[in-house]
Amino acid sequence: AYIDDFFRTETPTNPVNYNLVWSDEFDGSGAVNSTNWYHQTKLPSGGSWHNGEIQHYTNRQVNSYISNGILNIIAKKETFTDQGKTKQYTSARLNSKFAFKYGRVEVRAKLPTGVGTWPAIWMLGQNILESGGYWSSTHGTASWPACGEIDIMEHWGSNQNYVQSAMHTPSSFGGTVNRGGQNISTASSQCQIYGIEWSAEKMIFSVDNVVHYVYNPAVKNASTWPFNAPQYLLLNIAIEPSISSNFTQGAMEIDYVRVYQENALSVHNSTKNETIFLFPNPAINQLNIKVSDDFIGSQAKIYSILGQELATHILDSQQNTFDISTYQNGFYLVKIKTLKGIKTYKFLKN
């Protein structure tokens, strides 16, 4: 079953309860960071992308670039020949070079407009056999949909104010019954945070923390739940044959992509007698540093990610709170001097 027009009362877990394990903040301007992303451009057999899509995906900067801290994925109307095929539209399809199992994903994005545009923020099993995909040559063992597909956000220009989430598994795929969505009147005029929480039990989909779909099959097996293995992220705009003749180009603008996990790569360091804990992470206006008695009196220095020292604090109690409201958004380092040396931690200011 699926839900379309009502909301679950379930609420996503506050990301403060998670640790940030991977992100791209798309700082600066220029090319997409190739350490984080792979441009998938190889056409499937048959010479066209699935679902009747009519675009070429390219690795050119005109189709994907960073400008003033925003990733722009651009679908364009232009004649372009690649792999022996000439098409009239181009776009970009990015695969993350990071795969993970379970956690919370947040993507802050503004969507394109126009009938025939099909932007998506989604995930595929790292084990997918897909010629041209980033992970296929090293991890590919399963075809689609046995690998599992998680659509965090899909949007069709023909239904401008509606966004959808969906699941594709061997039990239901393509026109899957496992889907739900909500109306977002500002989907193309303002950024929204598209989120999913993925655990061993269920998937919770939301926009700006308003839940619109929960996938929690009563029976979990390879047919209904191929989701106990790592998945990776994809960002793209597809073009449908129904694209308007007046279309010239459209952009999906992405402010950030963040992946959080519980108890993984934590900013928590603990031995039998020593504890240092930074929270929340990400932080907004205040950073808390909780320490065991061993560290009371120690210095905590905050540095920019480039190594510039910004502040020095004394940890004068077990619970210490420091004002970071004047810091710009981004990553920072905290170095704490102890008898055993210097311990370094990273946090994100939002």
Language model features with spans:
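C-terminal outer-membrane/trafficking sorting elements
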Residues: 268-350
